[in-house]
Amino acid sequence: MALSMDNIVISNEEEIYMMKAMHIPCGLYLNMVLRAAIELDLFEIIAKSTTQKLSSYEIASQIPTKNPNASSLVLERILRFLASQSFLTCNITKNDDGNVHTSYNLTPLSQSLILDKDGTSIAPFLLLATDPVAVNSWFHFKDAILEGEIPFNKAHGVHAFEYHGKDSRFNGVFNKAMQNVTCIDMKRVLECYNGFEGVKEIIDVGGGLGISLASIISKYPNIKGINFDLPHVIKDAPTYEGIEHVGGDMFKSVPQRELILLKAILHDWDDECCVKILKNCWRALPKDGKVVVIEQMQPEYPEINLISKNSFSVDMLMMTMLDGGKERTKQQFEDLAKQAGFTVFKIVARAYYCWVIELYK
């Protein structure tokens, strides 16, 4: 009779917490196995199969390995691990001849790691998070306390934004991750927020390669968009219909438009810099215009739900990468807006982990 763990009941609370504690180090293993699975195209191979249900040997035969037979044995262990983490389902059947056949197919969780109909997925963000350049920063995390150092700067000798200009490979990894996450976020924003309706012109401040604007204009093609960022950033931006890329510095001035978008900008900077950015937006805004801020938001109390856990996790990332960058509470965002001169602060929607905030004069 096969051994199953599903019917084991652990009622001793001390034992439960000890077992949870013993499992904590395994979090690293999951991320690194997922990285390997993405690099090997495991999830895409399963998704593209006609049955979407493959054995380890069938998957190994589609990987450029020197020995599919031996590789399938190693792969079987990886697939079983991923199934135990809810990234795959494991199907065990017996053939007429009595032989056991094991196959695997995707789950909703692993579906997020394959390309969707828009050509985006979470996979590039996982590759960024587990990239050696990013991981090396965490070895200096304690220095943020001991020495007041920014871990990324300590690990690489330069500010994170400067490093991108020195390492084209990592810059490509970063840009691809941001492109995918932005597309996923904005698709959801456009499903739950209608504040772009009737708008004629939008400027995306710190818009990078123009992904957010492109998403908005794909739904509202009559909008004219200005993608505003540093000249060396927009020089690599692709051409989009309805979007003009304009070089400039948001700390000096912002071009005038009826709607100003700030997506994932404020969490990169300290309070003083944020107020400076928001004041420039206030000056550029007509009386009936609005600033749309899209950011994660922390609860006042560190709750243990998904939204709270993610915002506090990203806050640790900001601490690792940037000087002064951080996630903020509703009150902290509202205080920044008031200091910049805005009189109306509205939270109008939530898209996954992001909140949509409207600011008015």
Curated annotation (Swiss-Prot):
GO terms for molecular function: 3',4',5'-trimethylmyricetin 3-O-methyltransferase activity; kaempferol 3-O-methyltransferase activity; O-methyltransferase activity; protein dimerization activity; quercetin 3-O-methyltransferase activity; S-adenosylmethionine-dependent methyltransferase activity. The gene is MOMT3. It catalyses: 3',4',5'-O-trimethylmyricetin + S-adenosyl-L-methionine = 3,3',4',5'-O-tetramethylmyricetin + S-adenosyl-L-homocysteine; kaempferol + S-adenosyl-L-methionine = 3-O-methylkaempferol + S-adenosyl-L-homocysteine + H(+); quercetin + S-adenosyl-L-methionine = 3',4',5,7-tetrahydroxy-3-methoxyflavone + S-adenosyl-L-homocysteine + H(+); myricetin + S-adenosyl-L-methionine = 3-O-methylmyricetin + S-adenosyl-L-homocysteine + H(+). Flavonoid 3-O-methyltransferase involved in the biosynthesis of polymethoxylated flavonoids natural products such as myricetin derivatives, aroma compounds possessing antioxidant properties and exhibiting pharmacological activities such as anti-carcinogen, anti-viral, anti-thrombotic, anti-diabetic, anti-atherosclerotic, and anti-inflammatory effects. Catalyzes S-adenosylmethionine-dependent regioselective 3-O-methylation of flavonoids; active on various hydroxylated flavonoid substrates. PANTHER family: O-METHYLTRANSFERASE. The lineage of its organism: Eukaryota, Viridiplantae, Streptophyta, Embryophyta, Tracheophyta. Pathway: Flavonoid metabolism. Belongs to the class I-like SAM-binding methyltransferase superfamily. Cation-independent O-methyltransferase family. This is Myricetin 3-O-methyltransferase 3. It comes from Solanum lycopersicum (Tomato).
